[in-house]
């Protein structure tokens, strides 16, 4: 399979944090990227050329996680200051604060319908919250040590969590009970997530391993030993065929789950890589590290069928149709080591001037007075009530800061009506599909021509062999 792939390539290089980047997450439309940092700030990076990045101070200690809501109109962040903040990702940077736990909050994650989010904490608990009312719902408390990560399944019926008690647990949110426990006696996991079909979970271990478990059969399917240090984060490609991993060894690795092997090793960061994430379309992925940098990569591999596979996966997230997975092969547990050859990519040798990718940064905390919590709650609630609706308008953005030259801002709608804007976006998507279809046809035509050439060459050899035999 690797021979048909194209190598990933570094696209963007964002530098604005003053300390380690702890988490990265793409907006649902792929036009923005959120990052959290140990510098106690959240940043929103815009992919539109010559646009500004937004920097949101507000947390009192390191921010551990950040995530867009399914609609993309809210961003949630968790912090060592024991709080969770909900931000409107615009130039005003309004936020509401939830005093979520009695210890460090490690993770925050939205359900696919956008109605609920969960938090994981060093107080050994997982808590669920109603997003619209910003109220506590329930706790899951069977872990006996710090909870590092908690994630919803794609259909929202299950939660996967990992803890320093060396277990990965699967929870049924209807009954609020732990229905499955995977134990790893060699060390705890730093991160856990469901595959796009919701039938497997992958864990990133401090023992430098990556494990894929089948939650239907309660068996370990795949066990990868490809990193030289602890694994901090992982992300499934939307197709479910590839897994992205980040490690303290300073590398990002890409695993082919169908063939059960490592295919790419990416060198771009100067220090441990703490977070990785695929975009919702799968055509990009991002990484954040202790070097305070955010790198955005072009996927390139599996480019011919990304869109169709993603569409099929999205159709199978409906709770009325329980998923059936055949995308993890082989079905027997076995160890995968780094003994096989992977393609090493070091973009820093090819990208001499990475600073040109750094956008201007608006420090929201410096430019605008901090909004009182009551006002922020009122503003956010206006959007949270409609968080599952994708097309409501954002509030008007403030003008540029005094003394600075005015620049266009990403996310600001021009004079175009919403319906016309949506129509144009659909046309662009259709053109992209047509372009991709043409690429596929060209690829198939090339293969056909090669086969035909081979047949003609073999046909010419037949008379020669016949005369030799006579």
Swiss-Prot record:
Primary site of residence: cytoplasm
Protein name according to UniProt: POC1 centriolar protein homolog B
Q: Which organism is it from?
A: Xenopus tropicalis
- Note the segments forming the WD repeats: 16-55, 58-97, 100-139, 142-181, 184-223, 226-265, 268-307
Role description: Plays an important role in centriole assembly and/or stability and ciliogenesis. Involved in early steps of centriole duplication, as well as in the later steps of centriole length control.
What PROSITE patterns does this protein map onto? Answer: WD_REPEATS_1 (PS00678), WD_REPEATS_2 (PS50082), WD_REPEATS_REGION (PS50294)
CC annotations in GO: centriole; cytoplasm
The record ties this protein, via SMART domains, to: WD40 (SM00320)
């Amino acid at each position: 399979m690797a021979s048909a792939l194209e190598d990933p390539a570094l696209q963007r290089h964002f530098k604005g944090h003053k300390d380690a980047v702890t988490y990265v997450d793409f907006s649902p439309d792929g036009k923005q990227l959120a990052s959290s940092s140990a510098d106690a700030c959240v940043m929103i990076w815009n992919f539109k050329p010559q646009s500004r990045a937004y920097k949101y101070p507000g947390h009192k200690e390191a921010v551990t996680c950040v995530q867009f809501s399914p609609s993309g109109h809210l961003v949630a962040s968790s912090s060592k200051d024991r709080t969770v903040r909900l931000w409107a990702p615009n130039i005003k940077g309004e936020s509401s604060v939830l005093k979520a736990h009695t210890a460090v909050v490690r993770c925050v994650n939205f359900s696919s319908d956008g109605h609920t989010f969960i938090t994981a904490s060093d107080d050994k608990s997982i808590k669920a919250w109603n997003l619209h009312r910003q109220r506590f719902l329930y706790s899951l408390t069977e872990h006996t040590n710090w909870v590092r990560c908690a994630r919803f399944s794609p259909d929202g019926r299950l939660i996967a969590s990992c803890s320093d008690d060396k277990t990965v647990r699967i929870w049924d949110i209807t009954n609020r009970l732990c229905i499955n426990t995977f134990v790893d006696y060699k060390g705890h996991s730093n991160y856990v997530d469901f595959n796009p079909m919701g039938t497997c979970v992958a864990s990133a271990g401090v023992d430098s391993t990556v494990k894929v478990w089948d939650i239907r059969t309660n068996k370990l399917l795949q066990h990868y030993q490809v990193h030289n240090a602890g694994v901090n984060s992982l992300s499934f490609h939307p197709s479910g065929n590839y897994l992205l991993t980040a490690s303290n060894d300073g590398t990002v690795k890409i695993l082919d789950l169908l063939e059960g092997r490592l295919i790419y090793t990416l060198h771009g960061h100067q220090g441990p890589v703490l977070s990785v994430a695929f975009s919702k379309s799968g055509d990009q992925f991002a990484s954040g590290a202790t070097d305070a940098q955010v790198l955005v990569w072009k996927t390139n591999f599996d480019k011919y069928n990304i869109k169709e596979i993603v569409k099929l996966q999205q159709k199978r997230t409906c709770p009325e149709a329980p998923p059936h997975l055949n995308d993890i092969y082989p079905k027997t547990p076995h160890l995968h080591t780094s003994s096989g050859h992977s393609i090493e990519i070091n973009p820093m040798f090819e990208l001499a001037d990475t600073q040109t990718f750094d956008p201007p940064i608006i420090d929201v905390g410096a430019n605008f007075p901090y909004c009182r919590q009551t006002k922020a709650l009122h503003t956010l609630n206006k959007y949270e009530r409609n968080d599952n609706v994708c097309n409501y308008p954002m509030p008007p953005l403030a003008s540029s800061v005094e003394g600075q030259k005015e620049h266009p801002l990403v996310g600001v709608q021009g004079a175009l009506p919403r319906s016309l804007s949506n129509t144009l976006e659909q046309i662009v998507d259709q053109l992209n599909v047509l372009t991709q279809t043409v690429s596929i046809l060209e690829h198939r035509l090339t293969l056909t021509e090669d086969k035909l050439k081979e047949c003609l060459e073999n046909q010419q050899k037949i008379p020669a062999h016949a005369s030799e035999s006579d």
